[in-house]
Amino acid sequence: MLIKSFLDYLRYERNYSEKTVLAYGEDIKQLQEFAQEEYGKFDPLEVEGELIREWIVSLMDRGYTSTSVNRKLSSLRSFYKYLLRQGEVTVDPLRKITGPKNKKPLPVFLKESEMDKLLDDTDFGEGFKGCRDRLIIEMFYATGMRLSELIGLDDKDVDFSASLLKVTGKRNKQRLIPFGDELKELMFEYINVRNEAIPERSKAFFIKEDGGRLYKNLVYNLVKRNLSKVATLKKKSPHVLRHTFATTMLNNDAELGAVKELLGHESIATTEIYAHATFEELKKVYKQAHPRA
């Protein structure tokens, strides 16, 4: 009766869709079946944290993902919040329960050899557009900046004497990114071609043929078009080049803290995922090369 009254509450008072109500009911039913199988009975008013933990383990053993398990726990939390409000229970058995952590997918990136081949073999075309498009790909790879940071770059943000770019990241936080001689040459070339081809233009560093600032979809599609030449890539966005920058830096012995600053991450935990990515690559090489792997 308690489960039915909870589902009716969701259905008639919260106006949840029938599909959602049935999903809540199925989640509670799964716990009920587990309790009956393990202990021969199920009483919602007597459920304790130990039972919930055992159920979580059984779900993970059966191949449920962390996301699925956490969704089921969310259903149970709603059920016991309802029972607390109704005065049926005095303690929530899930109060000390923490669901399994979702595994973050490793970032998609290009190997250095793949990146070199892409840049060496791609014909970006002649004139202003070809010069600009090549520089965009090169700058993403050389600096690791975000798409929004690249299109937000103004002429005044480029300091050639110090070889520094001033970029504005998330929450308007500014940081300085150094650049090398190869990128500097490409930038000089682009500026000369740009200024001659489009004398009247905005203050933006990267511009369209009409002189206006680039927009996100234009740059996204440009990057996607060029990354499509790498058959092994599943994702083909500007962020792949950001991932490639970070992974390349770490593979060449850059300090994790330095890479964090260059990427503009607030927490080093965010940057650590690239260290995991490089480690996964090492494991792959080991398995392919070692006779005992």
Predicted ranges, named:
Residues 1-293:
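Conserved catalytic core of the tyrosine transesterase superfamily
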